[in-house]
Design a protein with these regions (language model features):
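Patatin-like phospholipase
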Residues: 1-40, 48-269
Length: 269
């Protein structure tokens, strides 16, 4: 029997929609035998919380409400050492605390996280120093800190300062492919991601357009190469950086994600 895995894409604030869709998958018992996880950016946060026993609807409690993000549009020269104006660590204290409380280890390494949970966890990030994609995991990078890897995976250029790990600078894994299926090709995989990209208006949207096209094409190619993938796609009414939403708005978007599960309306008819 093949191993079961879950792949969750990135998406910034749109991850709330993914949580809703993932909740329906979880509620149907489809994730019961999953022991391998792969996540990018917001998807890495979702996977980490799920691994320690926090289901998708419970994860809404840990979704950050951020009203003070600053942007630097010149930061799309992404190979400069300091791009972005915010340290991502500032916004993840609640997330880090719950992980530490659940496994009883402060600032765990990837090896310690695996030993505490028994789950293999791949976290994608782009190494801009060496110009390559990295899939952090407990076998290849046992001594890397879990939170460093997750922060690196979500360090969106223009928003967050790149994360330094062992002398290299890392940015959001989505700048290569926001749907990290590559480590899972030999497993029976459930994948949760967004469908076609939505292009935003304005200068910031135009600057993201090429990146979004690349990410979409890379995702489609990764899907083609995976021999045993059960794919769930959705759309979101949120934008990538809509991180200042109220609790009611988050819940509405969560339910929007739930309704996109193929069986949702059949069950609730």
């Amino acid at each position: 029997m093949e191993e079961r895995s879950l792949c969750v894409s990135g998406g910034g604030a749109k991850a709330v929609t993914l949580l809703g869709l993932l909740y329906e998958i979880h509620a149907r018992g489809q994730l019961d035998k999953v022991n391998i996880f792969s996540g990018c950016s917001a998807g890495a946060f979702i996977c980490a919380l799920y691994i320690v026993g926090i289901n998708p609807i419970q994860q809404l409690k840990y979704f950050p409400q951020i009203t003070d993000l600053k942007f630097d549009l010149s930061a799309f020269q992404i190979f400069i050492e300091k791009v972005g104006m915010n340290r991502i660590q500032k916004y993840t204290k609640k997330f880090r605390q719950v992980i530490e409380d659940k496994i009883g280890i402060q600032d765990p390494t990837l090896k310690e996280f695996y030993e505490a949970t028994g789950k293999t966890f791949y976290i994608s990030a782009v190494n801009t120093t060496k110009c390559k994609i990295i899939y952090f995991n407990h076998k290849d990078y046992p001594d890397i800190k879990l939170f460093d890897a997750i922060h690196a995976s979500a360090a969106l250029p223009g928003v967050f300062i790149p994360v330094k790990i062992k002398g290299s600078s890392f940015i959001d894994g989505g700048y290569y492919n926001s749907f990290p299926l590559e480590p899972l090709v030999d497993t029976d995989t459930i994948g949760v991601c967004f469908s076609k990209p939505v292009f935003d208006d304005g200068l910031f949207g135009e600057m993201l357009k090429i990146a979004k096209l690349h990410i979409y094409i890379a995702k489609k190619e990764a899907i083609k190469r995976h021999p045993n993938l059960e794919l769930y796609e959705c759309t979101s009414t949120f934008g990538l950086l809509d991180l200042d939403k109220t609790k009611m708005e988050l819940l509405d978007e969560f339910n929007h994600g739930r309704q996109q599960h193929p069986q949702y309306y059949k069950q609730n008819a």
